[in-house]
Amino acid sequence: MKRLVIYFHYDPAGCIDTACRIAVQAVQKYGRVVFVTNGTLAPADRVWVRQSGAGRIERENVGFDVGAYREALLTLGREKLAEYEEIVLMNYTLAGPVCSLAAMFTAMDARPELDFWGLTRHYAMQSRRFGGAVPEHLQSHFIAVRPRLFNSDDFWNYWKEIALPASYEQSIIRHETRFTPYFAARGYAWDTYVQTDDLKPVFVNPIMACPRELLANRGCPFFKRRSLFTPYADELRRTDGLAARELCDYVTAYTDFPLELLLVSLLKTQPLSALAQNLHWCYPVGAPTGETPDLNELGLRLLHYEQPAADPVTDWYNRQAAANADTLLAEAAALFEKNPMLGVLSPSLPLWQGCTAARRAAWMREKDALAQEVSVPVGSDPPPAPNCGWVLVRESAFPDGIPACTSQRDAWKLALTAQKNGAYAAAFEPLTGSAARADILNEYETAAAQPAAVAKQLGRLVKHRLQK
């Protein structure tokens, strides 16, 4: 089949990371690729596109994927596109493939009754964020269209008349959730390669909610980058919160996809806290063995810094955590061998709620200045480490030398510097801490479900606001 793939890309620095290159090279086996980027490519990356044999369009960063697809289609033109048997609109938000694409294209080539098809679908739902009633639709990260559709006036009118989005939400409303029902209503037949109708009562967005299931059992060759950094509170409203960790464990164990290289790329563009929450960078360790590791031989260095002033209870728990960490030094050091990208490690924050409140308040005071100093993205949540005045670092994560670390601010800068260098920060805790964390969560969930607790919390919030 003569196929054209229009591949949309965006990177604020104009770089094409390994995951994008793998995807482009994979689809090139099945068609000609036109690489469309919203921005200006770095010189070396522009050379890579040329050497790959792909076409290239560099454009102003307007209109998100919608603008990129529209410009590519209108630039190539109706007459040129009529030479193809299938046109694929694909974007960089997919990572992979984790397996050969032959099965997917062979299966869909055997379905000539379809006028357009996609990799996955999103089921109908209600969403204020996305304009109310969201219909069932193909997800725009991969949509293939065939001649009866792309040679029609319907197709070209759609793209000529579409209003370019100015936000992610507008992109979903104006294109992703509209494309499928728009053409289905005009008599064009569609379906997905990955079949998930049995999951419809469970998840509206299976590729995000259960990516491991789709890869392991349903032949899906791609997963979403966003799985690794999506807002974790949103995930907990839809799932058990384990999707990203299970996905990464599967990809690492059962595929050849270089997940570590994707993580290096994401560390440059996503807050460390978002990645840490989704990937659960808090490691349980067993009882201390009493061994004393040779940190110099392991390329590690133990640093201590002064904790911010706090109330007596918070201060006591922080000091206890640091003292306990000293007894677990061998177990902590072993985590670096197991996790090659680990650069900064500390004990997890004590479960005492005052510790959490104090750390968050300090982070909110420092985060914007730290982001500017280190030039990495930060979120409203602090990194998972360092905590409690105790931090173990991998020397190779700091090729320019380990910065001085005498305060909590310095410690956060240490974690962000490691992030900039392609390493992550994590926490560790004894098994008793992990068990207690589960019990505390259960207690909070039970209490939060009580109407009296909700009313009491609202009263506290109102009182707090009035006192300000």
Feature map (PLM): residue ranges:
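ER/Golgi luminal nucleotide-sugar-dependent glycosyltransferases, focusing on the catalytic module
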Residues: 1-468
